């Protein structure tokens, strides 16, 4: 079930939340998507008249939470120690009682076990959030199944919801799809200055005439950089001599970085492939590139960055795994006239090379049309406003049970 503006749960969600105390439990996070989501939900709760608490070990959140009307509660949400998890259950019971919590939303799979038991003891509704890909293996212990034991279970995509139904057969009637939200105001191409773009290209060391194929992802096997290197060799063999491939991300392990360098030499493309660190200015990087590629090897490799690239209108290529079809519209799943990017089979360098060449060959009008459709598709499904509205609708539904 996808909660949207037309859903009865999307209307008037603020009414049952006014005056309620909502506790979010999140693991320590770096600055990025998870942290932004927590802050956005906190701000939305405050606007509805609810009292918003956030239990986490991330002290960096404390100041920002207070500025938007939230309250910080120190809580070791990321612990995997069974004894510590038992103590967490007792901590949560005390927090729920002392703060008169009406509903708990846990975004940490490890804290879910404690939250399930604390909420049952307190007779409070619980919302849980699944991992981004819905989970990759059948759970064997109560610690692993707890994330699907909420009164309502949030999945970040239809793909994740479908996978969860297979892993957790008892969840279908409790599953709700709430897609990630992004601050689209920061992903407007007109807001990216020429100076930012030129600075990015200078950082990469590319010449003015060179077109860039960018892979903005952590360099790990699941992200598929090997496939891109092999595809680069095929692109080069087709006579395209003005293309540079930029791998913008930190290596998961130094040995893997060396393996990638060795593969580039083996494929004869070491002169056109450059490894750089993670981009300090992703919007400028997307605009500076002719094509942005995400050659993920599996569902785990479909990242938030692919949504951001599509949101700003970059010509985006994604492996056809996980939730990729929800991000990109492309044949054969959609009509060619509806194309917003390219979907390619994972681990197939030839298919990736074909998509890169097709994107690079587009004329100006066709390229602009793909970009407009891409921006519109992402804006309709992945806005911060939609995410907060749909999340609060799940809270309201849980409280009205």
Each model region followed by its residue ranges:
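A conserved mid-protein helix/loop that constitutes part of the nucleotide-sugar donor-binding site
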Residues: 32-40, 211-234, 245, 258, ...
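A conserved, positively charged/aromatic
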Residues: 120, 126-158, 162
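Conserved acidic donor-binding segment of nucleotide-sugar-dependent glycosyltransferases
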Residues: 329-349, 359-364
């Amino acid at each position: 079930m996808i909660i949207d503006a037309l859903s009865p749960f999307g209307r008037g969600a603020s009414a049952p939340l006014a005056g309620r105390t909502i506790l979010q439990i999140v693991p320590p996070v770096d600055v990025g998507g998870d942290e932004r989501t927590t802050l956005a939900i906190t701000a939305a709760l405050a606007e509805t008249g609810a009292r918003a608490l956030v239990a986490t070990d991330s002290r960096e959140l404390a100041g920002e939470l207070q500025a938007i009307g939230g309250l910080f509660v120190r809580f070791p949400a990321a612990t995997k120690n069974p004894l510590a998890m038992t103590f967490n259950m007792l901590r949560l019971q005390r927090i729920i009682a002392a703060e008169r919590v009406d509903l708990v939303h846990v975004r940490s799979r490890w804290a879910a076990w404690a939250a399930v038991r604390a909420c049952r003891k307190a007779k409070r509704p619980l919302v849980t959030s699944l991992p981004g890909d819905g989970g990759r293996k059948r759970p064997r212990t109560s610690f692993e199944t707890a994330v699907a034991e909420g009164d309502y279970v949030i999945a970040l995509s239809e793909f994740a919801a479908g996978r969860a139904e297979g892993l957790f057969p008892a969840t279908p009637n409790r599953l709700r799809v709430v897609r990630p939200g992004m601050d689209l105001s920061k992903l407007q191409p007109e807001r990216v200055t020429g100076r930012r773009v030129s600075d990015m290209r200078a950082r990469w060391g590319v010449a003015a005439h060179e077109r860039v194929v960018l892979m903005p992802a952590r360099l790990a096997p699941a992200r598929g950089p090997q496939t891109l290197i092999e595809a680069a060799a095929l692109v080069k063999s087709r006579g395209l001599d003005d293309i540079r491939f930029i791998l913008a991300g930190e290596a998961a392990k130094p040995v893997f970085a060396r393996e990638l360098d060795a593969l580039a030499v083996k494929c004869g493309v070491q002169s056109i492939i450059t490894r750089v660190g993670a981009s300090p200015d992703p919007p400028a990087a997307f605009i500076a590139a002719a094509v942005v590629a995400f050659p993920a090897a599996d569902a785990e490799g479909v990242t938030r960055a692919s949504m951001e690239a599509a949101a700003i209108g970059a010509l985006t290529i994604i492996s056809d795994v996980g939730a990729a079809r929800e991000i990109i519209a492309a044949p054969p799943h959609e009509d060619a006239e509806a194309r917003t990017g390219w979907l390619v089979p994972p681990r197939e360098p030839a298919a990736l090379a074909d998509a890169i060449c097709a994107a690079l060959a587009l004329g100006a009008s066709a390229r602009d049309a793909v970009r407009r459709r891409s921006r519109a598709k992402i804006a309709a499904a992945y806005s911060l406003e939609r995410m907060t509205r749909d999340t609060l609708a799940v809270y309201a539904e849980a409280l009205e049970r």
